Amino acid sequence: AASQLAASQIAASPKLARYKPFVEETRRSQPFNLSQPVERALTVRGPYVGKDPIVQFYDTELSLLRFEDPAGGKEPINMELLLSKLGSSTDAALRARALHSLSEGLKGFERVAALSLNVVAGGWLVENKERGYATVRSRRNVSNNVPDSVVESLLEGVRTTGVALSKRYYALKKGVLAKTQGLSALTWSDRNAPIDVGAGAEKEVSWEEAVGMVKA
């Protein structure tokens, strides 16, 4: 009755209509609510023992890491700048050094990463079971208003068709990088390498031409 009343009030008021998505999400999650004392306890403790402080701690520790500059700079660089070199440099040797620098710089961070993952994933699993969600993804699916079956279909598509498409993509990329950067093999550090097509980069291509290129 309360849900129907809220729906009718929203329908009758343009001012309330802006809150419709919030109300609908609240209604979808209502069957999974715990008792009021338990919900209150979780809310009160959240800033101190929930996932948020762990995620904040992880992000802070990660931001403090410094890595050897693969470009030869004397000053260490942060992860954001290092990763940008992996994705923007057309120099295969520099990309390889960047990946090596990343691997070396992350040594010693394993314990922080493992602890953070265990706390967040473990807490998510336990709480979702207590709330009665069908799978570990169901809570997110309810929030996104997407049925579990749709998400499972997407995952199955990635596991099957997605594998073939991924292989085809990297085979095509290997061919392009072989022509533009002289690579004889596509290494791990070349996965996110930019595709530089040289002087033709600014050429406009029609939709029909683009479709033909993809289907070729």
Where are these regions (language model features)?
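A well-structured
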Residues: 1-215
